[in-house]
Amino acid sequence: MGQKVNPHGIRLGIVKPWSSTWFANTQDFASNLDGDFKVRKFLNKELANASVSRITIERPAKSIRVTIHTARPGIVIGKKGEDVEKLRNAVAKIAGVPAQINIAEVKKPELDAKLVADSIASQLERRVMFRRAMKRAVQNAMRLGAKGIKVEVSGRLGGAEIARSEWYREGRVPLHTLRADIDYNTSEAHTTYGVIGVKVWIFKGEILGGMAAIAQQPEQQPAAPKKAPRGKGRK
């Protein structure tokens, strides 16, 4: 059977930036990497209900700068910035260097694979029918301008005795096109029947010009040009 490579990993340096952007000497690399892992683990646990999409980490001049991309910045910041100050102190303690925390708002959570996967997982935990949750996520993404979306759920769907996988796709999701901007992420729903895995692929268009184009327009990316539909090969 054919296996699917992680869409983010295969596009790193082509159309996808790294989530940790720092350079370290050989003796510091392991401790920095371990620090990044611990910081992310802590923030994801603390901000489990804050709709966090991703966390990017930079390390300028013996300090750490953490950018939290979230759809609900008010929850992260807290009243008069109290919560974000607590997070800053905790991150500085974990990393062992002075910390700075920036908050970036995710304008369209329906087009973010992590937030869509978490939304489907939370619906499954509330006993919403899996087909309804999948279809709703697909419709919302397409309505807000996605070029294509695929959602897959795996596990004891509907409490069935035998685990299985079901998926739903709308539009184009070209996994082999490296210039395609594909957002991919996963989540887990912990139900009374066991764990149900959720995978989401969202195709937002094609990025022409590679990383240089992303650097010039970090937020807005060009939409994919319309192409004629491909044939199905020889019959």
From Swiss-Prot:
Under SUPFAM superfamilies, the record lists: Prokaryotic type KH domain (KH-domain type II) (SSF54814), Ribosomal protein S3 C-terminal domain (SSF54821)
Its cellular-component GO annotations read: cytosolic small ribosomal subunit
Sorted alphabetically, which Pfam families does this protein's record hold?
A: KH_2, Ribosomal_S3_C
- Keyword Nucleotidyltransferase annotated: no
Q: Which GO terms describe its molecular function?
A: mRNA binding; rRNA binding; structural constituent of ribosome
What's the domain of life for this entry? Bacteria
Q: What keywords are assigned to this protein? A: Ribonucleoprotein, Ribosomal protein, RNA-binding, rRNA-binding
Pinpoint the KH type-2 domain residues.
Answer: 39-107
Tell me the CDD domains matching this sequence: KH-II_30S_S3
A Gene Ontology annotation in the biological process aspect, one of them, is:
translation
Biological role: Binds the lower part of the 30S subunit head. Binds mRNA in the 70S ribosome, positioning it for translation.
Describe the protein's quaternary organization and the partners it interacts with: Part of the 30S ribosomal subunit. Forms a tight complex with proteins S10 and S14.
In the record, the note on similarity to other proteins reads: Belongs to the universal ribosomal protein uS3 family.
Instruction: Identify the PANTHER family for this entry.
Output: 30S/40S RIBOSOMAL PROTEIN S3, SMALL RIBOSOMAL SUBUNIT PROTEIN US3C
UniProt name for this protein: Small ribosomal subunit protein uS3
